[in-house]
């Protein structure tokens, strides 16, 4: 049995989970998320726990089992606590600022790069060189953070660029010359 799939999901008291067929709706203090899951998986809901049950031991069912449980757990965690990713801008003159709800990055290009805030995503800029992306959907927060990082990924010679907080950037030695 899948080690992830067989874990039971605990539901906090301020979160409600409802199932309509294979569509789950999770509501909590931070917001609401809805997702349709694989029709082969079934859900056993008790007072404050949910268990994902697979019909057979086939390879397809085993692979989907753990994924379904992880996605549902992320939904519960997102509406109760939320998710957050922090990015750092490293480089001379690299800075970020807010323009309304959108993020504007000055990262060495001839023009500022503007990133629009999607529904459910908020940006926070601290000290002009730290950007915090937060929201209820783990997928959405990760995708937006990845898009921001891809504007100017860290380069290996001087380490300049946008990186995740705590990310290790492998450095290379420059040419030695004659």
From Swiss-Prot:
GO molecular function: rRNA binding; structural constituent of ribosome
Quaternary structure annotation from Swiss-Prot or TrEMBL: Part of the 50S ribosomal subunit.
NCBIfam families (UniProt xref): L6_bact
Pfam families listed in its UniProt record: Ribosomal_L6 (PF00347)
Keywords assigned: Ribonucleoprotein, Ribosomal protein, RNA-binding, rRNA-binding
Protein known as: Large ribosomal subunit protein uL6
Record has Ribosomal protein as a keyword: yes
Gene that this sequence comes from: rplF
Functional summary from the UniProt entry: This protein binds to the 23S rRNA, and is important in its secondary structure. It is located near the subunit interface in the base of the L7/L12 stalk, and near the tRNA binding site of the peptidyltransferase center.
PANTHER family listed in its UniProt record: 60S/50S RIBOSOMAL PROTEIN L6/L9 (PTHR11655), LARGE RIBOSOMAL SUBUNIT PROTEIN UL6M (PTHR11655:SF14)
GO cellular component, one term: cytosolic large ribosomal subunit
Any GO BP: cytoplasmic translation
